Regions:
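Glycine-enriched, solvent-exposed interface loops adjoining structured elements
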Residues: 1-76, 138-301
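Autoprocessing Asn-cyclization modules and mimics
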Residues: 52-143
């Protein structure tokens, strides 16, 4: 008998819910069954973020740095305006109605500017004014924080100089703790950044030290982001095939907590086994080289 020659098995949310209910000895009978299962699935994704590194959720972000600005969003944060051409990079903008302020880190198009985390909340239709250029324009849509808030953590970062040129070079920068950062006595020292601290707020912030002393730097970092939500039963899930068994087992366990308490222990054991197997496979396979020490030593008798 011929094989299918297809490798596109990709269950949607509804199929995972049906599988989970069947493992609980149940069937999906009502609309509320779908709702409660979808909620459990999103909570399961949140649990995976706490359990460790999910490599398919790593993405790279590049942020142009601005002289004398040390704090940046841990992702892409933009504002859509009527016209951006008269504003200058590095200047502070102020909302005429809200009084909110932010600094411009780049002008990405004729109607979009990238900004730092605002102090206050800009509102749609208000007028913003540039502190240096005195340019004015209208905010056409509220600032969307979704991209920045999807950041779970920062894994590594480099400072790139002369991006795109033949002389492009990357210099790694080290991550420091909150305690180390707060004890830096001269946070406004200008230099090429050599360290960063991740302030893990709901809207996470990257704090650099030293404060950039030129506009030729680009901050390039790898970040761990949230798995896409399971919103619609017809949606597929943002999970690679190697995690399909783990997802089905985990959802069955979560549903059993509410609807099949007699199966909780069994389904939990299956889920933990499936997760351990999937996590072990989802690892970095870089070569490891061990070099014996050549240090001299003295044998004491």
């Amino acid at each position: 008998m011929a094989v299918s020659e297809s490798v596109d098995f990709e269950p949607d949310v509804a199929e995972y819910i049906e599988e989970a209910f069947e493992r609980c000895g149940l069937i999906v009978a009502t609309g509320y069954d779908l709702k409660t299962a979808r909620r459990s699935l999103n909570l399961l994704f949140a649990d995976w973020a706490n359990r460790g590194l999910n490599r398919w959720t790593i993405e790279q972000v590049s942020l142009p740095l601005v002289t004398n600005i040390a704090n940046y969003p841990a992702g892409i944060l933009t504002m859509t305006v009527g016209a951006s051409g008269s504003f200058t990079v590095g200047e502070t903008i102020t909302g005429g109605t809200s009084g909110a302020t932010a600094s411009i880190t780049s002008v990405t198009s004729s109607t979009v500017i990238a900004i730092t985390i605002p102090s206050g909340t800009f509102v749609a239709a208000e007028t913003i004014t540039g502190g240096t250029s005195s340019a004015t324009t209208t905010v056409t849509a509220a600032v969307d924080f979704t991209n920045v808030r999807s950041t779970i953590d920062i894994l590594s970062a480099v400072i790139r100089q002369n991006a795109g040129a033949s002389t492009q070079s990357d210099t790694s920068i080290s991550r420091i703790s909150r305690d180390t950062y707060i004890n830096i006595p001269s946070k406004r020292t200008t230099a090429r950044p050599s360290q960063f601290y991740v302030d893990r707020q709901i809207t996470p912030i990257l704090k650099l030290w030293g404060t950039p002393d030129a506009t030729t730097y680009t901050l390039v970092f790898d970040r761990l982001v949230r798995i896409d939500d399971a919103d619609n039963p017809q949606n597929t899930v943002d999970v690679p095939c190697r995690f399909y068994p783990c997802l089905a087992a985990g959802l069955a366990y979560y549903i059993s907590l509410k609807k099949a308490p007699n199966r909780v222990q069994l389904l939990k054991a299956v889920y933990e086994e499936e997760f351990e197997r999937a996590a072990a496979e989802d690892r970095d396979r870089a070569s490891l080289t061990l070099t014996p020490s050549r240090d001299y030593y003295t044998l004491i008798r």
